[in-house]
Amino acid sequence: MKDIFIVEDDALIAMLLEDMLSDLGYRVCATAPDLERALAAAKDTEFDAAILDVSLAGRSSLPVAKLLDERGKPYLYATGYGSAPEGSTPSTLPVLRKPFQLSELEQAMKLLAEA
């Protein structure tokens, strides 16, 4: 699991996340700042796993999660809200609470790989 798709509406957080993932040996193969681009990339891009912001400019990323479920792609949520969005499929996938440290991201990625 090396190629990661990031869905994040805050450009600074997306860049920080990309840098952190690179430090951990992952490659970010795609990013999307809004729901429409996230859905398009989730359909058309090859990646191993995804990190989804729960809220994209006030819109839930749940449609992206459902598409990833259909494709069998693992993902985790990164959120300042503390939990996955309402309506999420119950799962053992980790939720990364913002703000997070490199060690927390590393642990979440390990859990994601094991899921």
Across the structure, where does each feature detected by a protein language model lie?
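Conserved acidic carboxylate
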Residues: 8
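Two-component/phosphorelay signaling modules centered on CheY-like receiver
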Residues: 11-30
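Acidic, metal-coordinating helix/loop segments flanking the phosphotransfer/catalytic sites
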Residues: 31-49
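Active-site residues of response regulator receiver
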Residues: 53
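Hydrophobic/aromatic residues positioned on beta-strands within the core alpha/beta folds
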Residues: 78-79
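A Lys-centered signature of the CheY-like receiver
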Residues: 98
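Receiver (REC) domain switch/active-site region of two-component response regulators
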Residues: 101
